């Protein structure tokens, strides 16, 4: 999805602009040649934001014709990352926070498209906010004009959902003839090209488990803050997590299927595994 379309989607979602205006000439994150002092208008060090998605089949999660949300992660410009950046803003009551903010529609959507494939949804949402959301510097409480407690939590979750809605991976793959099948296999280049078509031609990261496609990461640089700023698609900063060919794309509820355990995130660049 293009940058203008993302901006229109933000307006359509009814976002309340509670952040100070950012300078028009501020650079995109990770694209600056000199240091940028305005920490509320420039995402740093986590200047590469990733909208990440799961395809869980055993047990299945979410609708059979849709990928599901993993999260929104602020990676550093070199592909490294921070985690659990503010213990004082770690929460264990995401559902209650959203209800208090009147975000019932968001909560309903999350229950359908942001499930924990094996466990409690609330625990999953808490983990994503506590580990990743607290590391986005442009949504810290001091960046709001009129801050109310936990406002940034609801904004983070809403932004994650908004980005996900603009990245329909299932339809993008299907349009290219790539559909879930118990026996058919695909080339990595075919999958990457199909997904790049909804990401301004920029290649996402794809991951496989036991030869089966199970995760996608879409990368962005941001101009302005992470909620109201302009999102610019960029190519993946991480090496592919699937082989070049013979990739399975299994139907949900398949007996010979794989599950993307949300607790783990593979860093293919360093061949390490990290809690996610």
From Swiss-Prot:
Keywords recorded for this protein, A-Z: Disulfide bond, Endonuclease, Glycoprotein, Hydrolase, Lyase, Nuclease, Signal
**One Gene Ontology term from the biological process aspect of the record:** RNA catabolic process
Signal peptide span per the entry?
Answer: 1-17
Presence of the UniProt keyword Hydrolase in the record: yes
The enzyme's first-digit EC class, named in words, is: lyase
Q: Name one Pfam family in it.
A: Ribonuclease_T2
Xref: PROSITE patterns: RNASE_T2_1 (PS00530), RNASE_T2_2 (PS00531)
**Catalysis performed (reactions):** a ribonucleotidyl-ribonucleotide-RNA + H2O = a 3'-end 3'-phospho-ribonucleotide-RNA + a 5'-end dephospho-ribonucleoside-RNA + H(+)
Q: List the disulfide bonds.
A: 22-41, 30-77, 40-143, 85-135, 208-242
UniProt-listed Enzyme Commission number(s):
4.6.1.19
The glycosylation sites are: 32, 93, 256
Q: InterPro entries under this entry?
A: Ribonuclease_T2_eukaryotic, RNase_T2-like, RNase_T2-like_sf, RNase_T2_His_AS_1, RNase_T2_His_AS_2
Gene3D superfamilies the UniProt entry points to: Ribonuclease T2-like
Keyword Lyase: yes or no?
yes
Cellular component terms per the entry's GO annotation: extracellular region
Q: Which residues form the active site?
A: 70, 128, 132
**Could you tell me which PANTHER family the record lists for this protein?**
RIBONUCLEASE T2
* Misc remark: Preference for adenylic acid.
Name the protein family: Belongs to the RNase T2 family.
Q: Report what the protein is called.
A: Ribonuclease T2
Q: What is the lineage of its organism?
A: Eukaryota, Fungi, Dikarya, Ascomycota, Pezizomycotina
